[in-house]
Regions:
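Helix-adjacent hinge/juxtasegments
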Residues: 13, 17-56
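Short, contiguous alpha-helical
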Residues: 1-23, 65-116
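Long amphipathic alpha-helical segments
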Residues: 53-58, 91-95
Length: 116
């Protein structure tokens, strides 16, 4: 979950054209999950704002230097990255015959329903 939050943070940082910085958490904190969920809430709100902006060329810094890409491509990559991890979770659960967790309940539609 830390990886997912950190990656979401970086995608948001790029879209908001903020300077590169790493997102770090106290891995030993008893509040780690709550802190991650709180961070995701803020990240999600920032990403939602990006949807309303015109597509544009975004220049951003990575650990490997400066890059430039359309905002729509960055958003697409973020979605593909999330989907990749979703598939990995399903494969890991399936390998161990764990089927009582329905990932459809954790889809964006399920998330939006939970907010009502």
């Amino acid at each position: 979950m830390v990886h997912i939050v950190a990656a979401s943070y970086l995608y948001g940082q790029r879209l908001e054209e903020k300077p590169f910085s790493k997102f770090e958490f106290d891995m030993d904190s008893q509040d780690l999950i709550d802190n991650l969920l709180s961070a995701l809430d803020g990240i999600d709100n920032g990403l939602i704002e990006q949807v309303y902006k015109e597509d544009r060329e975004v220049t951003y810094e990575t650990s490997k230097g400066m890059r430039s890409q359309k905002a729509s491509v960055i958003l697409s990559m973020m979605i593909f990255h999330t989907t990749e991890h979703r598939a990995q979770i399903v494969a890991a659960l399936d390998k161990h015959n764990v089927r009582e967790i329905n990932l459809d309940h954790y889809s964006i539609f399920g998330y939006l329903e939970s907010l009502k």
